[in-house]
């Protein structure tokens, strides 16, 4: 008897992380290699400069088949773009796209089969390189805007955009914004991240963050913390008084950010 399993998830339960920064300079020799999407969605749509490239689904028979949500490999970076912009027919376009994707995956190396296809399509190496520079890209070539959409029940519910950094923002997250001071002091962990205009972590940002507090609060540790891998952290502790408090964070190259906390007072119980 066939069983029907109901999906009780909501759009807020869907996650999406992309393994690659899509920046050639982040990879050896400028060759990006494999790109994976980690998501619990049904499929993934991939766009380049607002042009739809392809849609990918989890491989449930591959090497990650034992996982409830196998990562999705993004293996086609050309898709239908050759038909749209180069005028190639439906027979030739997929073959040329396969050659370009192989060049991306294998650092410009071509298998004997791909070389045979190249000659049968009457493509010169220079013509192939021009297509590679245009649709895949190398160090120094114009950067594209890549968009990844996690598709769940037929609609996009999560989006990740990878593009050159245009602005830097300091993100401050207080993991326990309501503290209770009583017989002992209470404490909150704070996470700091340097992110770009799309919310992507900037792992090469190593600026120092200056911290200051207002209200019944004190910083546990130094008031200046350096970012490592684009991230840092600190701890805040109560001082024995109640009231509103505020943490201010300042970093060169980004707007100041702040976080609000509430300190409550619980009198020590008498025996």
Regions found by a protein language model. Give the residues of each.
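The feature marks long extracellular or luminal low-complexity segments
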Residues: 6-36, 42-271
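Short, small-residue-biased leader/transition segments that mark boundaries at the very start
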Residues: 1-5
